[in-house]
Amino acid sequence: MNSAGKSMLVCALLSGVLGGFAEETQWKQFPIWGGGYVQNVEISKSSPNVWYTYVDVCGPYRSDDAGNSWRPLHQVYSINERYRGMNPRSLSIDPRNPDSIVYVAGNSWDLKGNIYVSRDGGKSVRAVVKDLHFYGNGYRRWTGILLDRNPFNPDELITAPDSDGIFRGTENGEKWENAGLKDHFFTDIRYDLAVPGRIYACAPAVAPERSADRKPRQTGFYRSDDNGKTWKRLQETAPEEIKQARAKGNPLLGIFDMTELRISEDAGATWKPYSEGLPEAGKEYITNGRFQAIGAGSDFFLAVDTAGTVYRRNIGDPEWKRVIIRRRINREYETGGQLRTAQWFGRAAASINIDPRDEKHWIMTDWFAIWETFDAGKKWQTAIRNICQLISFTVAADPFDGNNLIYGVADVVFFTSRNGGKSFEHDPSHYSGILGGVCSIAFSRISKGVAFICGGKQGSTTILRSKDGMKTWARPALKGLPKLEYGKCAVYTLAANPKKEEIFACVSGPVEPGKGGVYKSTDMGDTWVWFSTGLPADMSYASGEWDNNAANPQIAVGPDGSAVTFNRKTKQLYYLADREKGIWKASDLRYTSWTLPVIAADPFVPGHYLAGCAANEYAESFDGGKTFRRLTTVPETIESISFDEHNPGWVALGCTGKLRVSRDGGKTFEVIEDAMSLPGGHSMRTILDRKRLFLITGASGVYTKELK
C-alpha cells in the first residue's frame, strides 16, 4: 500500500467510521399503540380525512385516513430541538390547506419553546419565533388550547405562552407581535365564533409549587374586542378552559377549579352555576366530578370527568345527563396492538370535540389513547394505530432464547414478547404489587426461565421475580433488604453475574448496613447481604423512576466476578477490590462534566469495562475497573453502552445524535446513519443483543434493526 493509501486508512480508523454493515434490515417499531397522554385532535376543514394530534411527550402526528392510522412528524427536529423537548402544546390547521399548519411547542421554563410552521404537511418545519415558554409536557397541559385561528380571517392567529405575554400572528403564522399581558400563566385562549375581533384568554390561579420557576403570576379572565390589540380584565377568577356553543346567544361553558362548570351568556362578563346533575368531586385526581375536558356542539355541551364518565346537556335542559356507554372497542388491541386501553377509558380526559360535519361524531383524548364515537356516545372505538407514545426505560432479551423479551416502560410497567418483538403481552395480573415504571431487568444466566424486574413509584417500589419464563411474577422474600420506599430506599438497578447465580441491586439512601448501597443475592433474590464496604455514605443511587438516567445501569458485573459502580453525585467510579467480602475502592476515573457516567462490562473479556460521559470522555479498563485509559474516538456525549452477550467484540454506543456500533470490543466504531431519521429524543440509548439493535426513544417506543 502506498503512503496515500495508508494515510486514508489511518484517517478512517481515527474517525471511527469504517463504512456500513454488509446487510441491515429496516428499522421496525415495537407494535404497541397507545400508552401516553394524548392532548387533542385537530381535523382539517378542507380535507376531513386529514387529522393531526399530539401527545404530551411527543408529536405531532398526522393521519390521512380520518384517524385509522397515523405517522409521526417529530423526526424532523434537530438535535438541539430534541434535547429541549419540543412537545406540542397546541396546533392549528389552515382551513384552506391541510398541509399548512402552525403549532406551539416546548417543555420547561429553562428549555424554552418555539412557534413552528409547516407548509408541507409536517415533512419539514420552521421555527418562526423562538424562546417562548410553552409546556407541552408541563403543568395544566390538559387544559384548553394556547393557539387559535381567527374564524373570520384564517391568516390571523393568537397564542399565549407562560409569562411572555399574548402574541398576535399574521400572514398565516409567519409574523408575530407581542400584545401585552405578561406575567400570566394562560391555560386557554380562543376566538369568539360569532363576533369578529373578539378573543377570550384564561389565566387562572397557579399553585406556586407547580409554576415553572416558582414565581407568582397574575390572574384573570380577559376579553379583547379589537382582535387582541387591547385587553379588558372581566374578572379576577378565570376558568381553566372554555367552549362556545353556536346556539342563540352563543353561550360559553367554563371549567372552574376542575370541580365546577359555569355558563356565561354575556360574552364572559358574568358566569352562572351550571353543574346541576353532576356528582360532587372526590378528593382524588382520578374521580367522578373532576373535569378537564368539555365540548360544544351547535346546541349542546359535553363534559368528561377524570374517571371517564361522559355527560351531556342540551341548551335549555335543567341538568346534565350521563351518556350511557354500551361498548368500548379497543381496535388496535383486537388486531395486535397489545395495550388494553379500554380499561382506562377516559382517564384524565384532556379533550372532547364534536365534529361540526356530524354532531354524533365525537372525539375524545385521554391518558392512553384517542377515542371516537359515531352514535353520540353509545359505542366508542380507539383511533391510535401507529402511535406508540410509551416512555421507554429498558429492553432485555432472555439469554437462553432471543425471542423472549421484556420491555420496561413508564406508567404501565412492562410488556413481554415471545416472538422477538413482533407482538407483545400486557397483563396487569403479571405485575401485581408494582405500579409505575420498570427501569431495570435482569435475566439469570444460569437458571433458564428466571428473570427479575424492579421499579415502581409511590408505595409500589419493589423487585419482582419470574421463575417460569415470564408467565407469572411474584415478589421474592427480599430478606436482608431494607424496606423499599419510593424516594428513600428504592431499587432501580439490577445486574446479574454472567457466570454465577448472583444478582446485585443498587439501593438508594445513605450507604450503611440495613439502608442504602449495593446488595448481593445468591438464592434468586430471597435473601440479600449488604455488599458496600468502602463506598461513600452518599452514593446517590436513583430513588425514583424519574431520577436523572434512572434506567441506565448503576452497576456493571463482569464474567470474573469483578464489578464497577459510580457515585451519581461526584461522578467517581468505584471497583470491587474484594469480591468475597464486598469491599470497594475508588477507581482512578472520575468524571467532571454535569452528565452522569455510563458503564458496561464485557461479557467475554474478564476485567474489561467501558465507561463514558460527556464528549471525548470515553474510557476503558482491563483490570476490573481499577484503572482506566481515556480514549478519544467518540466526540459525542455517551448515553448508553451495551455489549452483545452472544457475539464477542460487538458493542453499541448510544450517543447524543449518533448511534455507533463496534465489532472489535470498542476500539473502532461504525455509525448507523439512519438512526436519527427516527422520531424520539436526542439520546440514541441502545441495547445490543444477538446483532439486534433496540433503540430506546425518549417517548416514541422502541425501534429494532438487525445487523448482519
Residue locations for each model-derived region?
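Bacterial N-terminal signal peptides that target proteins for export
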Residues: M1-L9
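Extracellular glycan-interacting surfaces
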Residues: L14, G20-K708
